[in-house]
Regions:
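Non-transmembrane accessory domains of multi-pass membrane transporters/channels
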Residues: 1-61, 101, 105-121
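Soluble C-terminal extramembrane regulatory/interaction domains of multi-pass membrane proteins
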Residues: 3-10, 63-192
Length: 193
């Protein structure tokens, strides 16, 4: 749910997203996180009774909630499209980032389900780096002088959200790696019996 929602929100920055669509995206991700929290509480009870050796889901939950916050910030900027002159400069980089982030999140989800190592982060790092460069280039062109205060606020908010997203995806990488490491001994142990 998060992969599709972040991808849609990033795409919406260039062409705009209706508030109802954004609300639906948020609800889907929040529902998934709520289900994860329920499973996490049950797993904590099992761990405390020594019925399970599953990793603690709390750090993963915190990271996913941070990603939800990134989605909300990006979604708020996507309510109205950025002006064409800005979109021309940052749109291609945002499209690349949208695809890379969506793919990375889907692959992280698959890794969590299978207990495997996280996917390579290089493509998403490259795409978000290209976004940062595109936003820096846009700041240097003088285009921003022609923006209204609201447009300027949205421009800087999306830049900030992308920086936060990069940090939170790095955190997610660590959490997926921890889950994969915790799952590997259990699989090896089960296979040897």
């Amino acid at each position: 749910a998060a992969a599709a929602a972040l991808g849609d929100a990033l795409a919406g920055v260039t062409h705009g997203l209706h508030r109802d669509v954004l609300s639906h995206l948020y609800d889907g991700v929040a529902g998934s996180l709520s289900r994860l929290r329920t499973v996490g509480v049950e797993a904590a009870h099992e761990r405390s009774a020594h019925l399970s050796s599953a990793p603690d889901s709390a750090p993963l939950e915190r990271t996913l909630y941070r990603l939800l916050t990134d989605l909300v910030i990006i979604g708020r900027t996507a309510g109205q499209p950025l002006p064409d002159m800005v979109t021309a400069g940052v749109g291609p980089a945002l499209a690349e980032a949208s695809a890379a982030v969506g793919s990375y999140l889907r692959d992280c989800g698959a890794a969590l389900l299978t207990g495997k190592a996280p996917p390579p982060r290089r493509p998403v790092e490259h795409a978000l780096g290209a976004c940062g460069a595109a936003f820096a280039a846009a700041r240097g062109t003088g285009w921003l002088r022609n923006l209204t205060d609201v447009e300027l606020e949205r421009f800087f908010a999306i830049g900030f959200a992308l920086e936060q997203l990069r940090d939170h995806l790095e955190d997610l990488d660590h959490e997926v790696a921890d889950w994969g490491t915790a799952a590997r001994p259990a699989r090896v142990s089960a296979a040897s019996q």
